[in-house]
Structure formats: C-alpha cells, structure tokens
C-alpha cells in the first residue's frame, strides 16, 4: 500500500492507494496539525472519501479529526459528523449524522457509541451506537433503535433494541425487540 501525503498545499490532502494502484480513500482538510514530541495529528474540517472498488463512494465530513498515531488507520471524528453513501449515479443511498465516530479506513469500518440518525430514501431511523461495515455492506444500530418509514400512501413506525440495514438489499431488519431479548427476526 502507498500513501501519498502533502501538507504544504491548500487544502491539505492525503491519498491511500492499494497494491493495484487504485485509490482506497482520500482525506483532505483545511489544516493538518502535527504535534511535536507526539505521534498525534489533527485535521481541521476533514473531508474523507472511501471508494468501494471504483463503484460507490462514502463521503465523510466533520469539524475535527484526531489521529492518535498519525498513521491514518484510526481516525476519531468529532462535531457535526456526517456519512453519506452515494451510488454510481451520485444519488444518496444512506445519510448518517452523529456527534462523534471512529473511522478505520483500511478495514472500511465506522463505529460510534453516540446517538445517531440514519436517513434512507424511504425512512428515518435513530438509535444509540452504530457499526457501519462498508466492505460487508451493512449498518447496525446497537441500541434504542426507532425507525419511521414512509411511502406515498402511508407511514409505519418500528422500535426495538437493534436494527440492521443491508446496503445491497436496501432494507432494514429488526434484530431484537425491546423487553424480549430472545426474539430475533
């Protein structure tokens, strides 16, 4: 893997490529701060694009990013964190809003324990905690899941402990109902 890095240009940017020379992800921001006597670096107004085998893209933005080891394997995002997955036609498939999250670019994994809102073309789902596995194609709400779906003719509400959104099928599944830990749908 190769990482191209340039912090002297405006805006600051970095690009991660794989062994085949294809871009895995890009990260840019208004400013990169590297702290003396520390491995830590911070990015102000980060914008990250994770590419899925040249198909869809995940666009990730926040007000602040922290990389504790400056290796871009674990990036802590805070303040106004947004994830937007676009299809080949640049249509938003899923939009995730939260206050903080950790992105693991090489694993194509996103995690948070914060309150999260997920918007799809026909629903709005909220909950606490989230795991988004880009490679496997799912988004999982970890607790207090509540979904409101709507069509032209009606709306429907579903609540439970955990819910899973399949990015390929574009559908939600209730994993656990509240007050009934043995129920899996």
Describe each PLM feature range:
Residues 1-185:
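Mature-chain termini and adjacent capping regions
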């Amino acid at each position: 893997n190769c990482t191209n890095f340039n912090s002297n240009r405006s805006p600051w940017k970095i690009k991660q490529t794989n062994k085949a020379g294809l871009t895995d992800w890009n990260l840019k921001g208004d400013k990169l701060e590297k702290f003396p006597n520390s491995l830590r670096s911070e990015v102000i107004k980060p914008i990250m694009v994770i590419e899925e085998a040249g198909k869809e893209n995940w666009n990730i933005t926040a007000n602040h990013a922290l990389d504790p080891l400056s290796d871009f394997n674990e990036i802590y995002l805070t303040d106004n964190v947004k994830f937007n997955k676009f299809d080949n036609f640049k249509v938003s498939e899923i939009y995730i809003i939260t206050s903080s999250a950790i992105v693991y670019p090489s694993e194509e994994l996103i995690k948070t324990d914060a309150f999260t809102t997920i918007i799809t073309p026909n629903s709005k789902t909220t909950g606490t905690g989230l795991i988004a596995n880009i490679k496997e194609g799912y988004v999982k709400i970890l607790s207090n899941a509540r979904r409101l779906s709507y069509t032209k003719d009606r709306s429907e509400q579903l609540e439970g402990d955990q819910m899973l959104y399949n990015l390929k099928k574009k559908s939600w599944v209730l994993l656990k109902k509240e007050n009934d830990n043995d129920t899996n749908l």
